[in-house]
Amino acid sequence: MGPGSQRALFLLLLLLASPGARAFQSCLNKQQLLTTIRQLQQLLKGQETRFTEGIRNMKSRLAALQNTVNKMTPDAPPVSCPALEAPPDGKKFGSKYLVDHEVYFTCNPGFQLVGPSSVVCLANGSWTGEQPRCRDISECSSQPCHNGGTCVEGINHYRCICPPGKTGNRCQHQTQAAAPDGGEAGDPAFSRAPRCAQVEREQHCSCEAGFHLSSTTGGHSVCQDVNECEIYGQKGRPRLCMHACVNTPGSYRCTCPSGYRILADGKSCEDVDECAGPQHMCPRGTTCINTGGGFQCVNPECPEGSGNISYVKTSPFQCERNPCPMDSRPCRHLPKTISFHYLSLPSKLKTPITLFRMATASIPGHPGPNSLRFGIVGGNSRGHFVMQRSDRQTGELILTQTLEGPQTLEVDVDMSEYLERSFQANHVSKVTIFVSRYDF
């Protein structure tokens, strides 16, 4: 039966099912109607067979596809590198061992890092470089004792034996001369007559607060000043003053070094912010940075240009590289931005402590880097710090060794941006740290 006959029979079936079917039936005799019905039944049966065959074929193909998928090699787990341990007498920063993650190392005070300060997990499941170690260093090699003092080596520490007339943990202070006659030892203000009374034929004497009863060579009683500064200055006793204690008749008072003010409690010292006032002492064109007990005048400069590479100062503390020529690959690998940061720290700060954070932010409508790498790339005291990633977009500069001032440290940290493992740009932050002489 051709396509035309099939369409005719289909229309005939519709007519038979319509309300006017009776009028149509009167035009055909019984034999003609039965023949037409049989033809329609055969047509429907053929359509049903082809439909069933199509369903069966589709099921067969799906089953074959499922078998193929089941036989495929399962997805490989993410590549990771072997776990690393902190070196003896050192510390490890970083606990993720996947590709492109970094792990950082530093040593405890008294030890020096030998080897790389950080390693990166490679795509082949190995670390870059060798795992570093910590080597014991001589505490006296830096000649910490001043004024001819003798350095005595200890385990992770040293002590200075000072010559006559010098004192302090590094022999840096002049000893106070003994009080001459008429000084504190002989000053009438530091010794007073006691209050005495006869009680049942016996004499009882007492002293006012801040004095204690003492006997003289003649057997007489006298009230002698209690030197609170000497008593509480002994090792193991709490400090009366944050800085210096001055003994006074019957009491004491606390003083602060230059650049600090005494607080209301009479014991604590607070740094004076010389930069807060409108009339600070920095010349025009410089910026005043407050430090512990003083201030610094700074005016950071951009790197000098070379050839077609140059920088422009966009703010007092930031430089930006001018656009690179299309064919200058070395230019693109130089820092895109250089920023300057200044920190003021007290001596003997407890470590480890985060000092500085470096981060990136994506511009709306522009794809940002999908990988960042942080590191320390310069400075004069790299061994005191470690740069560690804290999250996907942030790196932290961590102080790992205690600092003792006064001293000025510089450390340059770098943030490199990658897009699909292709280098995009890097940014450098130059951090200058002013360490105070004092621990407050």
UniProtKB/Swiss-Prot annotation:
<dbReference type="Pfam" id="PF22914">
    <property type="entry name" value="Fibulin_C"/>
</dbReference>
<dbReference type="GO" id="GO:0005615">
    <property type="term" value="C:extracellular space"/>
</dbReference>
<feature type="disulfide bond">
    <location>
        <begin position="145"/>
        <end position="160"/>
    </location>
</feature>
<dbReference type="InterPro" id="IPR055088">
    <property type="entry name" value="Fibulin_C"/>
</dbReference>
<keyword id="KW-0677">Repeat</keyword>
<feature type="disulfide bond">
    <location>
        <begin position="256"/>
        <end position="269"/>
    </location>
</feature>
<feature type="disulfide bond">
    <location>
        <begin position="140"/>
        <end position="151"/>
    </location>
</feature>
<feature type="disulfide bond">
    <location>
        <begin position="302"/>
        <end position="319"/>
    </location>
</feature>
<feature type="disulfide bond">
    <location>
        <begin position="241"/>
        <end position="254"/>
    </location>
</feature>
<dbReference type="Pfam" id="PF14670">
    <property type="entry name" value="FXa_inhibition"/>
</dbReference>
<dbReference type="Pfam" id="PF07645">
    <property type="entry name" value="EGF_CA"/>
</dbReference>
<keyword id="KW-0325">Glycoprotein</keyword>
<feature type="disulfide bond">
    <location>
        <begin position="229"/>
        <end position="245"/>
    </location>
</feature>
<dbReference type="Pfam" id="PF00084">
    <property type="entry name" value="Sushi"/>
</dbReference>
<keyword id="KW-0175">Coiled coil</keyword>
<feature type="coiled-coil region">
    <location>
        <begin position="28"/>
        <end position="73"/>
    </location>
</feature>
<dbReference type="GO" id="GO:0043395">
    <property type="term" value="F:heparan sulfate proteoglycan binding"/>
</dbReference>
<dbReference type="InterPro" id="IPR000152">
    <property type="entry name" value="EGF-type_Asp/Asn_hydroxyl_site"/>
</dbReference>
<comment type="subunit">
    <text>Interacts with heparin, FBLN1, FN1 and DSPP. Preferentially binds dental mesenchyme cells and odontoblasts but not dental epithelial cells or nondental cells. Binding requires a heparan sulfate-containing receptor on the cell surface as well as an integrin.</text>
</comment>
<feature type="disulfide bond">
    <location>
        <begin position="282"/>
        <end position="297"/>
    </location>
</feature>
<dbReference type="InterPro" id="IPR035976">
    <property type="entry name" value="Sushi/SCR/CCP_sf"/>
</dbReference>
<feature type="signal peptide">
    <location>
        <begin position="1"/>
        <end position="24"/>
    </location>
</feature>
<feature type="glycosylation site" description="N-linked (GlcNAc...) asparagine">
    <location>
        <position position="308"/>
    </location>
</feature>
<keyword id="KW-0732">Signal</keyword>
<dbReference type="InterPro" id="IPR018097">
    <property type="entry name" value="EGF_Ca-bd_CS"/>
</dbReference>
<dbReference type="InterPro" id="IPR049883">
    <property type="entry name" value="NOTCH1_EGF-like"/>
</dbReference>
<protein>
    <recommendedName>
        <fullName>Fibulin-7</fullName>
    </recommendedName>
</protein>
<keyword id="KW-0245">EGF-like domain</keyword>
<feature type="glycosylation site" description="N-linked (GlcNAc...) asparagine">
    <location>
        <position position="124"/>
    </location>
</feature>
<keyword id="KW-0768">Sushi</keyword>
<keyword id="KW-1015">Disulfide bond</keyword>
<feature type="domain" description="EGF-like 2; calcium-binding">
    <location>
        <begin position="225"/>
        <end position="270"/>
    </location>
</feature>
<feature type="domain" description="Sushi">
    <location>
        <begin position="79"/>
        <end position="136"/>
    </location>
</feature>
<feature type="disulfide bond">
    <location>
        <begin position="107"/>
        <end position="134"/>
    </location>
</feature>
<feature type="disulfide bond">
    <location>
        <begin position="275"/>
        <end position="288"/>
    </location>
</feature>
<dbReference type="Pfam" id="PF00008">
    <property type="entry name" value="EGF"/>
</dbReference>
<feature type="domain" description="EGF-like 3; calcium-binding">
    <location>
        <begin position="271"/>
        <end position="320"/>
    </location>
</feature>
<dbReference type="GO" id="GO:0031012">
    <property type="term" value="C:extracellular matrix"/>
</dbReference>
<dbReference type="InterPro" id="IPR001881">
    <property type="entry name" value="EGF-like_Ca-bd_dom"/>
</dbReference>
<dbReference type="GO" id="GO:0005509">
    <property type="term" value="F:calcium ion binding"/>
</dbReference>
<comment type="similarity">
    <text>Belongs to the fibulin family.</text>
</comment>
<dbReference type="InterPro" id="IPR000436">
    <property type="entry name" value="Sushi_SCR_CCP_dom"/>
</dbReference>
